[in-house]
Regions:
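FAD-binding subdomain of flavoenzyme oxidoreductases
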Residues: 241-251, 261-409
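Glycine-rich beta-strand-to-loop/alpha-helix junction loops that act as flexible
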Residues: 214-218
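Generic, well-ordered alpha-helical scaffold segments in large soluble proteins
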Residues: 153, 157, 200-203, 207, ...
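N-terminal flexible segment immediately upstream of the FAD-binding catalytic core
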Residues: 2-202, 219-258, 287
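Short coil/turn segments at beta-strand junctions that form active-site/ligand-binding loops
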Residues: 207-209, 230
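Residue-level detector of anion-binding/catalytic polar loops
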Residues: 209-210, 281
Length: 409
């Protein structure tokens, strides 16, 4: 039960804060005027606007400025409008002309003789606004050029239909289960095979794009959310190949053991069903099992209600394959699996093997020995705060150190 608290202090603090003003038109987002002004004009512009708010006479200049910001903002937050303006340079020119016309009308209304200090602040805002309009205009040319370059580079590694700039694809990949939206991705990639991954990652690095791996998009940590417009979301949902439960030999065991191999885009429930058909239980059982994918389960070290008995993803992985931020292949194998929870083993040993982008040329290998107890926090169980996990790649990193492509459980 939560400790009781009085609301008087909280209400008093809330009343002292500046009100969340909503004067910018066409703003259907959760961003306040302050956040939009800072994004488009900079922090100094918001300070100036706040000073001038109490000195308005008719408010017409402020209204025209907010209309300029509203027009820019509604286009920036709507990929369909962006595509329309990219396809219609004449219409785009008319919009930019209208924005500059409003700023020119504000310029006409300046009265430097009445209050030089106030007029200087208005001039400062006009300079920032003109720069914002110019940047808005230039952004379309930059986007168009970058799209052509991206098409040329990415088509070497995947089919043209897998390179998606359309509004629907970008809108579908702007957020995850958090419903938190920051930026729309520049492009969405939907590769057909695991083999395409390393080449695509290398191409995205050449294009200077921030790479975001994505599976089912069911996460609640924001790991699949683009934070910059120059970002690419690599959707792994087409990587849905998997085996039935098969008995194979694994390192450290004389007798073969039952395992299942899956690609990163396989929905978790499909693996559970395969295990059940063979008379086994798949331990990884998040609430989102009907929609989440295996790659995300590994990146998050997913658990679920069955984890109490049989452990989380890390406890049950035999090996996994991933692409590093250097566009190399990395294969991680557990050498001495105890067929139980990893913290019960005195030492957990992993073999790391790096390969060239072709997937065949081995570049180096390394053995990583980690005390079993290092994976758990006393009295807590899985330590979600320990992202490093003694340097073990892929697991619990939320996609930050590479892109999971397949695994054996």
């Amino acid at each position: 039960m939560n400790a009781p608290t009085t609301l008087d202090q909280l209400l008093a603090a809330a009343s002292e804060e500046a009100p969340r003003l909503r004067e910018i038109p066409y703003n259907y987002t959760s961003f306040s005027d302050r956040e939009i002004v800072i994004r488009l004009l900079g922090p100094r512009a918001w300070e100036v606007l706040s000073r001038l708010r109490d000195e308005r006479h008719t408010g017409r200049s402020a209204r025209m400025l907010y209309e300029v910001l509203g027009d820019i903002w509604v286009v920036q937050r709507n990929p369909y409008l962006q595509d329309d303006l990219l396809d219609n340079p004449k219409r785009r020119g008319q919009l930019v002309e209208a924005l500059n016309h409003r700023l020119a009308e504000i310029e006409k209304r300046r009265t430097p003789g009445d209050d030089p200090t106030r007029d200087a602040l208005v001039g400062e805002l006009l300079v920032a606004a003109r720069q914002a309009v110019q940047a808005f205009d230039v952004s379309f040319r930059e986007t168009s050029d970058l799209r052509r370059q991206a098409q040329r580079v990415l088509r070497k590694h995947t089919a043209r239909d897998n390179i998606k700039f359309d509004g629907l694809s970008r809108v579908s990949h702007v957020t995850d289960a958090t419903d938190w939206r920051v930026e729309y991705p520049f492009v969405v990639l939907t590769p057909d095979t695991e083999a395409e991954m390393a080449g695509l990652v290398k191409a995205c690095i050449e294009l200077d794009l921030t790479i975001i791996p994505r599976g089912g998009g069911t996460g609640y940590t924001g790991g699949a959310i683009p934070l910059t417009w120059k970002s690419v979301v690599i959707n792994t949902e087409k990587l849905e190949a998997m085996s039935e439960v098969e008995v194979v030999s694994i390192p450290g065991h004389d007798q073969p053991v039952p395992t299942v191999w899956t690609e990163a885009g396989v929905v978790t429930q499909r693996v559970s069903d395969a295990a059940e058909r063979a008379g086994f239980v798949f331990a990884v059982d998040p609430t989102s099992a009907e929609a989440s994918c295996i790659g995300g389960n590994i990146a998050m070290n997913a658990g679920g209600k069955k984890a109490v008995l049989w452990g989380t993803a890390l406890d049950n992985l035999v090996s996994w394959r991933m692409v590093t931020p250097q566009a190399e292949w990395l294969e991680v194998s557990r050498l001495d699996h105890n067929l139980g929870k990893i913290h019960d083993a005195p030492v957990a040993t992993f073999e790391l093997r790096w390969f060239a982008p072709d997937g065949r040329t081995e570049r180096r290998r390394e053995t990583l020995a980690i005390p079993g107890q290092a994976f758990r926090k006393e009295g807590l169980g899985k330590d979600v705060t320990d992202k490093f996990l003694s340097g073990l790649p892929g697991i619990q990193k939320e996609g930050c150190d590479g892109l999971i492509t397949s695994a054996r459980w």
